[in-house]
Regions:
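Glycine/aspartate-rich loop-and-adjacent alpha/beta segment that forms the canonical ThDP
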Residues: 83-125
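Short secondary-structure boundary segments
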Residues: 30, 68, 91-93
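Conserved beta-strand scaffold positions in the cores of enzyme catalytic domains, especially
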Residues: 28, 64-66, 88
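Conserved thiamine diphosphate
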Residues: 43-79
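Thiamine diphosphate
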Residues: 1-34
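Short, solvent-exposed amphipathic alpha-helical segments in soluble enzyme
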Residues: 16-20, 44-45, 81-82, 105-109
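Active-site pocket-lining segment
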Residues: 32-41, 57
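Short, well-ordered secondary-structure micro-motifs
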Residues: 12-14, 38-42, 76-77, 99-102
Length: 125
């Protein structure tokens, strides 16, 4: 299964469940750009020191690895595809700003915009 780092951080409990159940046919590939791309490129926890691979290891994943280069990916493909699961591979990627991406927004801005949409301008009185 493929997930982004932000999505994985929101569902860390699933790692513990897969590890405890020893889900042998499960491979989780985390595409880690260290940002919440879907909501405006806010920095994600993975970019602030949380290591998803180490979290997977701590929950009991027998195989968890981080890939940073194309050469490392080439070396890891067999392990990712055929390893005794559950397997987690964090693939670090860089993020180039896309012209269609939302502008960066912080939490307070998003909260205020949401309140205004629900309650109108009087939401800020």
């Amino acid at each position: 299964m493929f997930v982004g780092d932000g999505e994985m951080m929101m569902g860390l409990g699933s790692l513990a469940t897969a590890a405890v159940d020893r889900t042998e046919n499960l491979t989780v590939v985390v595409i880690d750009n260290e940002h919440y791309a879907e909501t405006g490129m806010q920095p994600a926890h993975a970019g602030r020191g949380v290591n998803i691979t180490e979290v997977a290891k701590a929950t009991g994943f027998p195989q968890a690895l981080t890939v940073r280069t194309a050469a490392e990916l080439e070396e890891a493909v067999d392990r990712i595809l055929n390893g005794q699961g559950p397997v987690l591979a964090t693939i670090k990627v860089t993020t180039d700003p896309a012209p269609t991406a939302l502008p960066p927004r912080d939490g307070p801005f998003l909260r205020s915009r949401f309140r205004t949409a629900l309650l109108g301008a009087e939401a800020h009185v």
